[in-house]
Amino acid sequence: MCSAGENIMNKIFKNVAIGLTGASLIMTAASAEEWRFNNFLPETRPESAQLEQFVTEVNAALGGETSLKLYSGGSLGLPNTDTLRFLPKGAVEMSLMWANYLGRDAPALSSVVVQGTIGSIAEFEKAIPTVRDIYEEEFAEWDVASVGYVAIPMLSVSVFCREEPVRTIADLKTKKLRVWARDQVEAFTSLGVAAQIIPQEEMYVAMKTGVVDCALYPALYAHTVSLQEVSKYASFLYPMASGPYVIGVSADRWEKTDDTVKAAISEAAEDLWVRTNQYEADYQRELDARDKLVEQGIVWGEDFSDEDRQMFVSSVTEIWAELAEEAGGNAPAYRERVLEALGR
């Protein structure tokens, strides 16, 4: 049997042990670091699912000491056009970036790959390594480290309209058209089409209320923004290759990041690139998406003619040169590097 004194001592030791355990848990929780990963793409986009897998792989490798948490659909309230402003300052630890959205602050970025100027997978694959190198160099100028890439499918861009089918550039001249990039505004304007940039998140309302009559958008992603609810007709206009999305981290943060964390992110990023840098099934996915839209009520019309398609491609190719010259700085040299990679 234990004496009263021994009982008291046992209780003291037990309480001390519990206290130390609790303190240890608190210190462990306090030392665990969470990186917020800003993703401006809707949660329903295929790329978002790929980013979720990337996050899962990083977290599994790190075992909880540092973890990533993905915030999709712009849920953190950070405009994607402001990425070069908020990311270097540490508003979030990590963010998805797309060069074509960043032309206001970095004009050279938006003219590296102008959509519509590269129309085949074979040609695009020649340019990808050069495009990645350019992005890494340019983002570094903004104190952002490029730590990963997400390939964008070879897309087929179509014209979705509210009230009547549009299958020619001539008919499009009588409509107000929603686009998403300045090069598109300039190209369509040169063809006599009234085009305006409307952000993806505002497109549904703009179509529903008649702010625009038609919207330029890939059929593959139309369901993610419920475009079939505000459109009755659609027709394919042109194929489109895009520079990849970039996963960015403040250069200062990345420099200070533990090598173990860097290695986990880099390895998962390489897996992400390998998974997404595949284009063989893109056209079939496009056809499947069109069939699904037809089931949901869209009338899918004949394609725009080859003549109209070439008219647009010629226009946007000229705009590419003009935008690069206007941007100045490294932009003309970037364009020349891409053209050289393409063999043009």
What residues fall within each predicted segment?
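Bacterial N-terminal signal peptides that target proteins for export
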Residues: 9-19
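Sec/Tat signal peptide C-region and signal peptidase I cleavage site
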Residues: 26-32
